[in-house]
């Protein structure tokens, strides 16, 4: 419904909601009736938005802008594409509301031509309902760059023709939080592409780090800053790699994190100290945002300071006023294999031995440690007195967490991670076929792997499929191999 709310705008949305309640208050209304009320109240046909419920896959939105200074005309071409899926080989164009602003060289949003009866505005919603369309803005002073999908106006993957300098400009000057974050993500992905290509110098990486270093010293919202300082998630990046080399992708992402940490340098420790002293344990949004930044600073600081930062993290673990902070400190120590990690792990196990939900987190943290020898650690943890294959939550925390969130260990080049999950599936299937089937879904993307790992994982799947399995597990295996 956020799609429709974004398409209509606040005033039209309220008008439509008033009409909806006038018609259906107290009734079990359908989505069709809801859209009909909103649309008819505003003279707009919203029924095409039902296609979002019926069509699988995430649309890709490609944007290309062009400015004609002679005619003072800015043209924005939008194109959408949704990749075919086995259940729907032919995808239709969806209605995609795209909130747009054009920023001037000083960062101001340029005034856009007003429609009849409307006040002047600095952004607008363009609806792309066809595979491709060009939108023309007349009488526009020279724009520096277009800001797209403001307010996350549609759940799509955005691809633009913005250069690294354009993205850095948006990151510095855009007032919309989502557009700012999207610019940071695109710039990070561009830097990562350069690292993966083995380029001796990656200008995008320098621009990304320099821009974030400048923002780090401003009074930007802490919650937003924490997100800007976080590169795209590994699993998200993996979806765009074909073939996928998990080790290379993980190493490239580590390069981004390490380079950013060195660029921020001593400022990380100083900001962490400041945030820690001002932390009062509040539950409001601002307090949660400060804690998010506090934890992000600690993770980056631990990468470059091998003496003071681990001691601070160990102290934070002991004195943490919340589970969020305790887990962040422990996770940071584990990720960097700090000497203090072992003692903290032992303390956590003792402290929460009787708390099953919290102990799940203890298993999950260890399963996610980004080291090749985590395969052996996970195998050993299966023998822990508090681990049981009969406990679905414990299996999910340790084994599913390992396979889904630890690319370095799970995709180890010798196939040990695959064999670990293969054996676990055999054991679990005899006890709980539903849990086994859920765990098996972590193996389904084997075709996208580079040849060596693809062959190893396929062999594991074939051995499982050849054995006697439950209907639930067998169905997942057949679909994965079919």
Regions found by a protein language model. Name each.
Residues 7, 20, 24-26, 35, ...:
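Generic detector of bulky aromatic hydrophobic side chains
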Residues 54-55, 96-98, 158-160, 231:
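Generic structural "secondary-structure junction" signal
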Residues 1-74, 194-214, 435, 449-458, ...:
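Amphipathic alpha-helical substructures
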Residues 23-29, 122-133, 155-162, 242, ...:
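Short, exposed beta-strand "edge-strand" segments with a Pro/Gly-rich flavor and a Y/T-containing core
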Residues 11, 24, 64, 99, ...:
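Surface-exposed loop/turn and secondary-structure junction residues enriched for glycine/proline
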């Amino acid at each position: 419904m956020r799609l429709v709310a974004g398409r209509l705008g606040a005033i039209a949305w309220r008008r439509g909601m008033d009409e909806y309640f006038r018609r259906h208050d107290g009734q079990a209304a359908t989505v069709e009736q809801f859209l009909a009320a909103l649309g008819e109240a505003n003279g707009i046909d919203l029924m095409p938005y039902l296609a979002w419920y019926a069509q699988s896959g995430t649309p890709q939105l490609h944007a290309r802008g062009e400015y004609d200074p002679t005619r003072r005309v800015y043209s924005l071409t939008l194109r959408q594409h949704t990749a075919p899926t086995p259940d729907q080989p032919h995808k239709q164009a969806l209605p995609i509301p795209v909130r747009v602003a054009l920023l001037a060289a000083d960062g101001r949003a340029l005034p856009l031509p007003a429609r009849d009866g409307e006040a002047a505005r600095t952004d607008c919603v363009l609806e792309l309902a066809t595979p491709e369309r060009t939108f023309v803005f007349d009488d526009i002073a020279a724009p520096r760059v277009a800001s797209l999908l403001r307010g996350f106006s549609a759940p799509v993957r955005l691809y633009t023709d913005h250069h690294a300098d354009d993205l850095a400009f948006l990151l510095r000057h855009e007032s919309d939080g989502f557009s700012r974050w999207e610019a940071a993500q695109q710039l990070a992905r561009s830097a990562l592409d350069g690292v993966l290509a083995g380029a001796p110098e990656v200008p995008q990486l320098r621009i990304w780090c320099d821009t974030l270093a400048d923002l780090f010293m401003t009074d930007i919202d802490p919650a937003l800053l924490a997100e800007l300082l976080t590169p795209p998630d590994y699993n998200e990046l993996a979806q765009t790699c074909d073939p996928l080399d998990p080790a290379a992708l993980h190493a490239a992402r580590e390069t981004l994190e390490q380079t950013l940490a060195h660029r921020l340098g001593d400022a990380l420790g100083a900001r962490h100290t400041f945030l820690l002293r001002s932390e009062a344990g509040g539950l409001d949004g601002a307090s949660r945002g400060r804690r998010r930044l506090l934890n992000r600073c600690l993770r980056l600081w631990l990468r470059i300071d091998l003496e003071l930062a681990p001691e601070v993290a160990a102290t934070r673990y002991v004195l943490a006023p919340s589970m969020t902070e305790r887990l962040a400190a422990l996770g940071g120590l584990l990720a960097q294999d700090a000497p203090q990690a072992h003692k903290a792990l032992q303390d956590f196990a003792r402290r929460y031995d009787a708390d099953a939900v919290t102990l799940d987190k203890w298993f999950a943290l260890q399963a996610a440690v980004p080291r090749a020898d985590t395969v052996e650690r996970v195998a050993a943890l299966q023998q822990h007195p508090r681990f049981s294959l009969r406990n679905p939550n414990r299996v999910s925390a340790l084994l599913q967490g390992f396979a889904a969130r630890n690319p370095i260990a799970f995709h180890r080049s010798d196939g040990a991670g695959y064999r670990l999950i293969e054996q676990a599936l055999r054991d679990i299937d005899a006890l709980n076929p539903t849990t086994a089937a859920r765990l098996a879904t972590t193996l389904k993307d084997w075709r996208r792997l580079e040849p060596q790992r693809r062959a190893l994982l396929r062999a594991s799947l074939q051995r499982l499929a050849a054995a006697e399995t439950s209907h639930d597990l067998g169905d997942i295996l057949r679909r994965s191999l079919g």
